[in-house]
């Protein structure tokens, strides 16, 4: 069974406000392993393209200085806390706080999975 990424084509936010960029991997597939979730800005300068990542064991990271870790958070993704707990990465919704004009643009949510490979969806954030 094929999996797909469900995103909204456009999300609108207010300057200074908080916006959520929904991203879900559907449908739930038994035995599907998500090895990494990333959010990228394909139109940004090279060192600002990787906005956020969530690893099943290492948890979240926010490599780009813009928007940066102080303005980003994963809404419901959870990392594995031990051998008996599975990471919960099907919902990779990203919250962006303190919106600025520079935040406007395309955001790509990408799931790296085994055995299905990489699947992605793109959202336009309008501020």
PLM features: what roles do these ranges have?
Residues 19-28, 35-44, 95-98, 103-114, ...:
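Structural signature of extracellular immunoglobulin-like
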Residues 118-120:
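A structural signal for beta-strand boundary/capping segments at domain termini and interdomain linkers
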Residues 14-16:
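Solvent-exposed, conformationally flexible loop/turn segments
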Residues 8-12, 54-104, 113-115:
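Extracellular beta-strand/loop-rich beta-sandwich domains predominantly from IgSF
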Residues 1-3:
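Proline/serine/threonine-rich low-complexity linkers at boundaries of modular beta-sandwich domains
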Residues 27-74:
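N-terminal V-set
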């Amino acid at each position: 069974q094929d999996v797909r990424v469900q995103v909204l084509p456009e999300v609108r936010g207010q300057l200074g406000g908080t916006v959520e960029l929904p991203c879900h991997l559907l449908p739930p597939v038994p035995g599907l392993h998500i090895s990494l979730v990333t959010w990228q800005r394909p139109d940004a300068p090279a060192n600002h393209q990787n906005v956020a990542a969530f690893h099943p064991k290492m948890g979240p990271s926010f490599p780009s200085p813009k928007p940066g870790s102080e303005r980003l958070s994963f809404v419901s993704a959870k990392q594995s806390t031990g051998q008996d707990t599975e990471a919960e990465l099907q919902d990779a919704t990203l919250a962006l706080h303190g919106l600025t004009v520079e935040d406007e643009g395309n955001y790509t949510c990408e799931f790296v999975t085994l055995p299905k490979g990489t699947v992605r969806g793109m959202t336009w954030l309008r501020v």
